[in-house]
Amino acid sequence: MQYRKLGNTNIDIPIIGLGTMTWGQQNSFEEGYEQMDYALSRGVNFFDAAEMYPVPPRAETYGDTERCIGKWFAQTGRRDDVTLATKVSGRSKDMTHVRGGPRLSRDHIRKAIEGSLERLQTDYIDLYQVHWPERATNFFGKRGYSHYPAADGVAIDQTLDALNELVDEGLVKNIGISNETPWGAMEYLRLASERGWSKIVSIQNVYNLLSRQFEVGLAEIALREDVGLLAYSPLAFGVLTGKYIGGVKPKGSRLALFERFSRYDSLQSEAATAAYFEIAKEHGLSLTQMSLAFVCQQPFVTSCLIGATDMNQLRENIDAFEIKLPKETVSYTHLTLPTRKLV
């Protein structure tokens, strides 16, 4: 297993991180336990969770993914073998079951970390991340930016001050951001530098062959500021496995179960996926192998977060990271570039 430094810390994390957002919804706790056992056996010791998981977020299942991990820690005693990441939810009018509607203020962050620590059955988090911004900006695939400063809500300096307090208390070892913009990332970095607060060590954003916006602006920040990308959705909600080619939606698949996961459910995405499928086939690879290998070979990527709903998927995904794409294959992905008009 290949490992990379988490930002400017002395923590080595694997190029593969274990995503957990299906545990408690598409996967049972027992299946989550099996995935954690197997991941560790393969050297994958970086687990990424969130207080709102599993997805889609519901009051009935809120926090269940963290509970699954916490019970596994209690059963196995392997907390110290894992670099554990979780997230505090940003502002959302649709999640009133979370503290009446989550915010990134000091009191909300305090309640969030206390809840996560209890559910995870641990006394510290290795990486605590802001799941999405408080302010009115673009994330989760939103296009067409509109500027509404009056709707910004809790300012970044207040959020970072609260996070820094958790670091000072030892409840959190490092902090990161997620679903952020170049401006947001630089604001966190500026405030940390000016006020002597903890610096963000990672940014967890979407990155895959169908969604490469990170390369514009954020990739340079990641490399110059040592804030590596934790790439989520490297298979684009499973679209880049090829299983949806031809408009098929297999029973039990994410796109069949949940209509809200429609970011890549379009004719353009289908055409791009089909083109990538042919490139992979020409080079003796599965589409999954090529898609994952492409992401992890980017110099700005620290770790690629993979999730699976069954063990065969997990094995295939981990195996894919043993593949190194030749320059010719990478060049073909750039030359084809069916993503120019995509998400």
Mark where each language-model region is.
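Aromatic/hydrophobic pocket-lining residues that form the small-molecule binding cavity
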Residues: 32, 65, 109, 113, ...
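N-terminal binding-site loop/beta-alpha segment at the start of enzyme catalytic domains
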Residues: 1-86, 123, 162
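Active-site mouth loops of central-metabolism enzymes
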Residues: 21-30, 97-107, 148-151
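Short, acidic/polar
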Residues: 28-39, 105-118, 189
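Conserved, mostly hydrophobic/aromatic
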Residues: 6, 18, 47, 69, ...
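Beta/alpha (TIM)-barrel catalytic core signal, keyed to glycine-rich beta->alpha loops juxtaposed to Asp/Glu
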Residues: 133-328
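Conserved small/polar residues in nucleotide/adenosyl-binding loops
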Residues: 333-339
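Surface-exposed, active-site-proximal loop segments in enzymatic domains
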Residues: 60, 90-103, 136-145
